[in-house]
Amino acid sequence: MKKTLVKSLYRETEKFIDKDIEISGWIRTIRDSKSFAFIELNDGSFFKNVQVVLDDKIENFKEIIKLPISSSLSVEGTLILTPNAKQSFEIKAKKISLEGNSSSEYPLQKKRHTLEYLRTIAHLRPRSNTFSAVFRVRSIAAYAVHKFFQEKDFVYVNTPIITGSDCEGAGEMFRITTMDLNNVPKEEDNSVDFSKDFFGKETNLTVSGQLSAETMALAFRNVYTFGPTFRAEDSNTSRHAAEFWMIEPEMAFAELKDYMDTAEELVKYIINYVLEKAPEEMAFFNSFIDKSLFDRLNNVVNSEFGRITYTEAVDILQKSGASFQYPVEWGIDLQTEHERYLTEKVFEKPIFVTDYPKAIKAFYMRENEDGKTVAAADLLVPGVGEIVGGSQREERLSVLEKRISEFGLNKEDYWWYLELRKYGETKHSGFGLGFERILMYITGMSNIRDVIPFPRTPGSAEF
């Protein structure tokens, strides 16, 4: 008999009524009396469990009812409708086979566990209700990203994880080396001789695929990359991780407005797709994680995102009369408290803040005519703050060279990026959307460690 997924039983119940089926899964709970028992079985294909009813006519009944939680079973039986019960159907078992026993020391018992505790058993936490929902939503959201861009004829490109350049110019990168750390080759001035290293130069884990994606956009027009990025920031906060995933589109013949239009459409698309494809998981989050979740998400998808300049934002904040931990003045990098005040108290919806001071933005962002600001825009959303950052890219060779020098970067490391400006350069724009950031927003989870399967943070690289 072909095995049936529990998801199919829920999505196509009519097809299986009074039919003999076989399912497999792990025991979530067992309730028994002398002559019959109820098993909640989960096979990983669906958020909900299926109830299996067995009686003492089952050959191994006494053995089965003594099994610990998380033991795995195969069940042959008949699907029976139960209109007057909590669940709409159940499986009347005819035969049950033990696939694998579980230790009685299995840590995920029926009681509720804290998120902090579950992080210590990251190899087992996907079996809990919360993380079953989180990681299924992560999968669905990732598919939505690809679906959105493929429907718009963007080309999916893979950018290097090992790089010799620093996209952000921040220097917070993980270094890669195969050199013997007990016998590092040195130059005459006692600096490290990277010419003796594997790649013959200093290399790092990428902080962004943007620069490489730009090269592809100037061949294919519209491209996107979606992959892991790494930041060696010693930031032990709920919003930062050393390894995370970024969605980074780049669009040729596109100005700042085009980036903002695309980013707004993408965010709404991902949220709507998850709401449609994961209704059970989203209902769980709204009930147990954030009771205002549906209201917040519906506000996002039904709003036309606002657009204000950085200068206007500073003016609004200064005139608000609100007390902020970080004082507001022109030239500062807006903090989360400022971003949330704008989105929650002033506009009550997502907004783009544009035209930031060039001193606080990356070297590749196009300098505006005022010489003080760049054509950059951050998307701020209620409850979180920034989730998207992007800009029109600097296409003028002389200006880009000047900006690289201002940042104290080595122009030779960017020779190929500069050369793009010599061969049919055009205006182009792009942005980065932190995948974990939008997952936190969609699920209501408040810590980035809880939306990535095996989080990498300062002092922690388990599993």
From Swiss-Prot:
Keywords: Aminoacyl-tRNA synthetase, ATP-binding, Cytoplasm, Ligase, Nucleotide-binding, Protein biosynthesis. GO terms for molecular function: asparagine-tRNA ligase activity; ATP binding; catalytic activity, acting on a protein; nucleic acid binding; transferase activity. Signal peptide: none annotated. It comes from the Bacteria. Pfam families: tRNA-synt_2 (PF00152), tRNA_anti-codon (PF01336). It is found in: Cytoplasm. Gene3D superfamilies: Bira Bifunctional Protein, Domain 2 (3.30.930.10), Nucleic acid-binding proteins (2.40.50.140). PANTHER family: ASPARAGINE--TRNA LIGASE, MITOCHONDRIAL-RELATED, ASPARTYL/LYSYL-TRNA SYNTHETASE. This is Asparagine--tRNA ligase. It comes from Clostridium kluyveri (strain ATCC 8527 / DSM 555 / NBRC 12016 / NCIMB 10680 / K1). The gene is asnS.
